[in-house]
Structures are given as C-alpha cells and as structure tokens.
C-alpha cells in the first residue's frame, strides 16, 4: 500500500527538497493552499486536500483540514482491527506522515502595525489539530514540526521504509511542545489584551537560547532560555562582539548590572558588579571619569567582575579598562578604536552591545523566582520616586551636597543584597555592606570598607533601622547624613540618636529589599 504524507507549512525552508525525496521513495503527498502551489510549481505532484475531504476550503481558509477523512487517517490505530474496519467502511485512507508548521502568530504580533483582527486571523486551528492527532498516534504516524528533522526522517525512510519508534516518540514530544508553546503565546497575548493581572493559569513560553556547560556550580546542569517574545534590552538579546560564551553566573551577574544602570540615565555612569552586588558605581560628566570613579570605589573587587557603561566606550576609557581582568563589558556602543583596544590579546573578554534606548520596555516585565514546588511572580522594583516626597525627620536639613549624595546613594542601595548598606559621596560608591543577617553588621562592613574616604560621605539603608545602635555606629564613623525608608516601631529612637549627634536623616517611605 502506498504511504501518504500530509504537508502544510508556513515556513517552506527545505520543503521542496524534502517532498521531492518523499516522491522518490514512492510516497503520495496531500497538501493545502500555498504549500500545494509551491510544491506544484516545483514539479512535485500533490493531492489537493479537498480531494481527500470532499469539501472545498471555506471561510477564507478557516476550514480546510478539520474533517474525519483527515483526522481519521491520522488517529486510526494500525493494531486495532475495529479502527481499520471503521476507516474502510468510511472510505478513510491512512496518513503516515504529517509535516506541519503553524500560522506565524508570533511574527504577526511582533509587527509594529499589527491589529487585533490580524492577530486573531493568524491563530492556527487546523494545524495544531493535525499535529496533536499525529503525535497522539505516534505508534504509527511520524509528525514533523521542524525542518531540522527532515534529514533524519528521510534517512530512516530510505533505510527501512519507516521511521523508528524512538524517532516517532521524540518527534511527538517535540510536536506537543510546539503546540503547547504556540497556545501559550496566544494565551499570553489575550491575557495582555484584557488586562488580566492575576490569571488563574500562568502560561509563558521560552525558546532554548544556549545549552550551557554547567550551572552555578560544575555539578549542576543548566540551559539558557529566551522569552518567545524577546526583550530588546536584555542579556538574551545582547549582541556579543567578542569573547567566550556566557556562563550561567555571567548571565545572572550581567542581568543584575543592566538593571542597576537603568536608574542612572541622566549622567554618564559606570557600574562594576561582582556576585550580583555592585562593587563600584561612578557618575561624572564624561564616561572616562565615571570609569575612574567606579574603579577607584573598589579596585580589588572589580577583578574578574562585570562592567556596564551607559555611554559609548571611547578609546581613552578602553585604554584604562584594558589592563584590568574583566569577565564582561556591556555598553550601548563602542568606537572602532575602543573595540580594537579592548580585544587586543583579550580573546576571552566578553563584550556585549545593548540598545539602551529600549530600557523602559524592559522595566514592565514580571520577575519569576522558582521555589520548590512553585513559582513566585512579582513586578520589578522600579517604582518612581520623587525626592520632593521624602521627609527630613531630623532637626538638621541636608546641605545641597548631601542632598545630591543621598539621591545617588538611594539609587545605588536598591541593588545591594539585603541587609544592604551603602556609603557614597555625590559621584561614587565608597563602601558596601551586603547580605548580612543583621543590619548593624552590614553597617560595620560598609564603614570598614569606606574608612579612608568618609569625609562628606552619606549612608543609605535598604530598609529601616530596627534599633538606634546603627545610628551610633554611623555617627562614630563621622558620617553626617543618612537615607532610609523608615517604618520601624522604634523610628523615634533612631531620630533622637541622629539629632543627638547632629546628623541629618531622610525617610523615603519606600523599602528596597533584595534577596
């Protein structure tokens, strides 16, 4: 009995050669619409879908394959006599191979001129139905959704006139992933259209971006997936200009770095980062000086770190960066001379380019955190804050220089691991206390790191001070200005201590925990 294949594809890459080889192997081919036209024009003889169903395509192509003659041919179990008899009684011929990819819904909704009606018209119904029928009956039917599998299928058909069960099972799993991801993308689109903030089912889809050597540690397997609808300002979408593949830890650190730099849009800024914590942030009138400040903030910790700059990297800045061992440099652009300097004898240095003008769109994405047996979802900590809404709670008001430094410190503290303390002046970080289980411990660490640079320094805390002992430590170090959220039942004790030592202290009313 002549075997039959059904081919209906929107992506016609490689399909002509695939179909020709099928014909050479003695297969009949059923086809639809544009696929049939393409195959016929290439000299590949095909059977029209309406010759199989007995019905013409109708309703602008919405109904063409949803028919028992198609799905019966796909779903009939070859090992069940009753199925075969039912097919015979109803003049249903079996279909042994399905090659289908779906209407380009993703590509459609990514178009800047897409309308709601156009998006709806690009929701495939018949294609997923055929794929699911074929995949369910993978004991007998081969289903192909990816042109990368054409060669494997043809090779097995040429060798043994049929594919192996192992291949059919693998391709069935791939087909179910394909239809599930397709439906998830449609669900995501409609959820956004109706403004549903807390859907009872969370459906998101990601595509494999990179198979990784290992995860956070060598004993951990890992892979990198990118959103099906890519975010332009993201490490997943970054253009890599030089260096090795990014590691798991590289990606996490780089992601943290590009989040931090978003808050420093107004001035040339450089952020140096290590293990998800900023080790140096510098801000100036030009990017070279901003680098000087970021490097000076902690010339030890920057070794092996990640650096992100929010202006084009020029030759002068590149000359200063080149001698330092860095894992990654990220910037919106690089001058030709700067790129030549940075890549000289630095084949492993990862250099990334990102569209910084797309930062705003990246801020509206949800954050997902995996926990055992579940997933936490929250919006990003990108709340707009206006210093005019802050409250000076002490007798002494901040000086103009202190006010500028406190604003800088408050931007920086948001990305320090809790309990987080940061000491800065008005243009660079000076000391960092991160990840301690008590706040006074973080205060002591930050002061120790900044001890030689405390003249004119200010201090920021990501959450309130639970006890006045923090204020005593800060005052003893000679720091005169503090910014914190407030909100402790003992706030007055901290205020009294600050007044006693002549400190100025601001309450912002916004906490910035980061775990």
Swiss-Prot record:
Chemical reaction(s) catalysed: (6R)-10-formyltetrahydrofolate + 5-amino-1-(5-phospho-beta-D-ribosyl)imidazole-4-carboxamide = 5-formamido-1-(5-phospho-D-ribosyl)imidazole-4-carboxamide + (6S)-5,6,7,8-tetrahydrofolate; IMP + H2O = 5-formamido-1-(5-phospho-D-ribosyl)imidazole-4-carboxamide
PROSITE patterns assigned: MGS
Protein keywords: Hydrolase, Multifunctional enzyme, Purine biosynthesis, Transferase
GO cellular component terms, semicolon-separated: cytosol
MF terms (GO), sorted A to Z: IMP cyclohydrolase activity; phosphoribosylaminoimidazolecarboxamide formyltransferase activity
Residue ranges of every copy of the MGS-like domain listed in the record: 1-145
Entry keyword annotation includes Transferase: yes
Pathway: Purine metabolism; IMP biosynthesis via de novo pathway; 5-formamido-1-(5-phospho-D-ribosyl)imidazole-4-carboxamide from 5-amino-1-(5-phospho-D-ribosyl)imidazole-4-carboxamide (10-formyl THF route): step 1/1; Purine metabolism; IMP biosynthesis via de novo pathway; IMP from 5-formamido-1-(5-phospho-D-ribosyl)imidazole-4-carboxamide: step 1/1
GO biological process: 'de novo' IMP biosynthetic process
InterPro entries (UniProt xref): AICAR_Tfase_dup_dom_sf, Cytidine_deaminase-like, MGS-like_dom, MGS-like_dom_sf, PurH-like
The protein's Enzyme Commission number: 2.1.2.3, 3.5.4.10
Domain of life: Bacteria
Classification via Gene3D superfamilies: 3.40.140.20, Methylglyoxal synthase-like domain
SUPFAM superfamilies: Cytidine deaminase-like, Methylglyoxal synthase-like
A UniProt-annotated Pfam family: AICARFT_IMPCHas
HAMAP family (alphabetical): PurH
Family label: Belongs to the PurH family.
Comment block on domains: The IMP cyclohydrolase activity resides in the N-terminal region.
UniProt-listed PANTHER family: BIFUNCTIONAL PURINE BIOSYNTHESIS PROTEIN ATIC, BIFUNCTIONAL PURINE BIOSYNTHESIS PROTEIN PURH
Name under which the protein is recorded: Bifunctional purine biosynthesis protein PurH
Organism: Streptococcus agalactiae serotype V (strain ATCC BAA-611 / 2603 V/R)
Gene that this sequence comes from: purH
């Amino acid at each position: 009995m002549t075997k039959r294949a059904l081919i209906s594809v929107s992506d016609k890459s490689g399909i002509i050669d695939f179909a020709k080889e099928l014909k050479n192997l003695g297969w009949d081919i059923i086809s639809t619409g544009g696929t049939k036209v393409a195959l016929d024009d290439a000299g590949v003889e095909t059977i029209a879908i309406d010759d199989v169903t007995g019905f013409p395509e109708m309703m602008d192509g919405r109904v063409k394959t949803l028919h028992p003659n198609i799905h019966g041919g796909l779903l009939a179990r070859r090992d069940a006599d009753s199925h075969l008899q039912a097919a015979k009684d109803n003049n249903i011929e079996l279909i042994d191979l399905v090659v289908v990819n779906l209407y380009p819904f993703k590509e459609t909704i990514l178009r800047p001129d897409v309308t709601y009606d156009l998006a709806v018209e690009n929701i495939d119904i018949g294609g997923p139905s055929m794929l699911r029928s074929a995949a369910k009956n993978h004991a007998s039917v081969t289903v192909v959704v990816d042109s990368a599998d054409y060669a494997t299928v043809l090779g097995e058909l040429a060798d043994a006139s049929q594919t192996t069960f192992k291949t059919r099972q693998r391709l069935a799993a791939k087909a179910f992933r394909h239809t599930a991801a397709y439906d998830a993308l449609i669900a995501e689109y409609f959820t956004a259209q109706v403004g549903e903030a807390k859907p009872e089912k969370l459906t998101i889809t990601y595509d494999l971006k990179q198979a990784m050597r290992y995860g956070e540690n060598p004993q951990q397997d890992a892979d990198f997936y990118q959103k099906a609808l890519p975010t332009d300002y993201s490490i997943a979408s970054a253009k890599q200009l030089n260096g090795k593949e990014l590691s798991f830890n590289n990606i996490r650190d780089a992601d943290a770095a590009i989040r931090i730099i978003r808050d420093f849009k107004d001035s040339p800024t450089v952020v140096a980062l290590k293990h998800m914590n900023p080790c140096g942030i510098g801000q100036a009138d030009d990017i070279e000086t901003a680098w000087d400040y970021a490097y000076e903030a902690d010339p030890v910790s920057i070794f092996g770190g990640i650096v992100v700059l929010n202006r084009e990297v020029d030759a002068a800045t590149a000359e200063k960066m080149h001698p330092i061992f860095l894992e990654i440099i990220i910037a919106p652009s690089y001058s030709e001379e700067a790129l030549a300097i940075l890549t000289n004898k630095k084949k492993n240095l990862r250099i990334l380019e990102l569209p910084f003008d797309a930062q705003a769109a990246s801020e509206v994405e949800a954050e997902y955190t995996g926990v055992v047996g579940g997933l936490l979802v929250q919006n990003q900590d990108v709340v707009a804050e206006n210093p005019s809404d802050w409250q000076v709670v002490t007798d002494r008001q901040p000086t103009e220089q202190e006010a500028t430094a406190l604003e800088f410190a408050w931007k920086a503290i948001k990305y320090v691991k809790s309990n987080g303390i940061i000491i800065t002046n008005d243009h660079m970080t000076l000391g960092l206390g991160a990840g301690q289980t008590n706040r006074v411990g973080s205060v002591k660490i930050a002061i120790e790191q900044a001890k030689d640079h405390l003249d004119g320094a200010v201090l920021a805390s990501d959450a309130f001070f639970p006890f006045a002992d923090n204020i005593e430590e800060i005052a003893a170090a000679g720091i005169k200005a503090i910014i914190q959220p407030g909100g402790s039942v003992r706030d007055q004790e901290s205020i009294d201590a600050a007044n006693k030592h002549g400190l100025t202290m601001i309450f912002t009313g916004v906490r910035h925990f980061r775990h």
